[in-house]
Amino acid sequence: MSEITIRPVLTKADRKAFVDLPFRLYAHNPNWVPPLKDEVHGLITPGKNPWFEHGEAEFFLAERGGQIVGRISAHIDHLALKQPPEQGMGPGCGNWGMFEAEDAAVAAALIARAEDALRAKGMTRSMGPISLAMWDEPGLLVEGFDHPPVVMMGFNSSAYAPWVEAAGYAGVQDLLTYDLPIDKGLPEL
């Protein structure tokens, strides 16, 4: 198997590859709901996303054999650094997110690169996956892969949780969504 190279997103072509990767990875998954590409471009562009007024981010691509096989962000929300640690973030806590990987080796390399980037910025803890803003798409889908995601909830491969756990991460909080068929009226309370 070819060597995995992790490189920063620097050019317009890199940004396009970063945005386009999930479209290839989930092309045959009927439950994946693709985002609007222009919206994702806006999220990762400092002049278009107000999050960058209080945050900073680096974006990385994983490449193997000339093909993009993964992506990740390493980011710091300076407002979150001011929060008490018992609220989940706090001083020294950086984040990684926008995570996609073809396999476990790519996942491990990407997470390690994001952690290195956060350490280089003085962070002493890492939490992820979290999109740039904590309230966009936090965490991993760990069950319900047979349903499309609801608004503001991410979608990922069922392989991701074991890969993230292999990197030393553990779940912090469960976020739940519920589905109720209402075609026959609402149930009695």
Specify the residue positions occupied by each region the protein language model found.
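Membrane-embedded alpha-helical bundles of multi-pass transporters/translocases
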Residues: P22, E53-A57, R71
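Short amphipathic alpha-helix that is part of the acyltransferase structural core
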Residues: S2-G47, G92, L175
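Acyl-donor binding region in acyl/amide transferases
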Residues: Q83-Y169
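A short helix-loop-beta-strand connector motif used in the catalytic cores of GNAT acetyltransferases and
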Residues: T45-L61
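Short low-complexity, flexible loop/linker segments enriched in glycine and/or proline
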Residues: L43, L141-G144, P187-E188
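Feature marks short, surface-exposed loop/turn motifs that line or immediately flank catalytic pockets
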Residues: H78, L132-D136, K184
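Conserved beta-strand in the GNAT
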Residues: L61, Q67-D77
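Acyltransferase donor/substrate-recognition loop-hinge adjacent to the catalytic core
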Residues: E3-I4, G154-L189
